Amino acid sequence: EDFKEAAIAGRHHGFSNVKETIQEIHQGMSKAYPCGAGIGLMGVSTSGDVALCHRFAGSDDHKLGTVRDGVDREAQARFLDTHHLANKTDCSTCWARPTCSGGCYHEAHTRYGDTTQANLHYCDWIRSWTDVCLKVYAEIADRNPAWLAQFDREPMAEKVS
C-alpha cells in the first residue's frame, strides 16, 4: 500500500521487490530462467572453483569451471538447456510462470535434491505476490501513468531465453 501511494504521488519508495516486479510487468518480461545463476551471476569458492551462484560456491556438483581455466561453456550450456522453463512441466499451466520461472535452484536443491525441480512449495505465495503487483500496477497506470514511463527508458538486465 505504501509503495503504491508513493508511486501515485510520484515519490520514490525503497521497496525494490515491488518495483522490479512492476518493471517486469510493464516491459512484458517473460523469463526463461528465474535468475542469473549460471548465466551472468556465478559464485567463486575460496579454492577458485566457479559455481552456479554464491549459494553453490564450494559444491563440486554445481561447479562450472575454475578461476584459472574459466567457465566450462559445455557444462554451462548443459545446465541452461536442462533448466530452461520449458522443461519445468509443473509450471506449464501456471499463469505466473513468466515472472517466476520455477524459482531458486538452490532452494530446489535443498528441498527436493534436484535443481531442475520447480519450487512447488511456494507457488501459492508467488501467485499471490504477482496478483498484488498486478493490482498495484493497474492502479498506478490508472492514477499516475507517467510514473511507469521510467521503465520505458530503463530496460531490465537482459534475460536469456
Listing of model-derived features with the role each one plays in the protein:
Residues 1-25, 54-101:
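C-terminal accessory region of radical SAM enzymes
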Residues 10, 47, 86-161:
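Radical SAM enzyme core and accessory elements
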Residues 32-33, 79:
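Residue-level detector of alpha-helix boundaries and kinks
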Residues 27-31:
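Short, flexible cytosolic linker that couples an ABC transmembrane/permease module to its adjacent nucleotide-binding
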Residues 35-38:
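Short, small/polar residue-rich loop motifs at catalytic or cofactor-binding pockets
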